[in-house]
Amino acid sequence: MKKTKVLLTTLLAGAVVLSGCSSKTETSSSSNKTEQKEEKKNSNEPKLGTPIIFDKQAEITVKSATWTDERNGFESKPAKKVLLVTYDIKNLSDKDIPIGMELSLYVNGKKAESYPIQVTLNSLSPNRALENATHAFAVNEEGSLELEVQPFMSTSGKKIIKLDVK
């Protein structure tokens, strides 16, 4: 159990350190052009059940995000709610990739901590797929939920799925 926590913590720290993000904001003098760009941007937003392809790296499909009553009796950090995310991943690269570091949850813009239940930590060979991988998050406040999706050590940008979990 301690080795799993150390591995998970190390991978999370590595993902945070190595993930870079850039945001581009385009402005237009015409409000019509701005509205059209926003419509196109919204239509390309990733959604649950829709495959997200990261060029020559991975294809990730977030299948579901549900609240669970399951708790880890050994976890010292309290969790008001636990969100369990289930996803499929396919390795599109020519090298093994680590599984379990693709997702980050933000609640009201604040990063939620991973919660140690049903966490899939694995590796995936080239051109292979893993179905029903899971990742859990501790959610301690109400608000908007955004799931960031990005393969571990990816150079391509992350994708954000806005969640509406009841």
Q: What name fits each language-model region?
A:
Residues 1-8:
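Bacterial N-terminal signal peptides that target proteins for export
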Residues 10-12, 16-166:
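Conserved functional micro-motifs across diverse proteins
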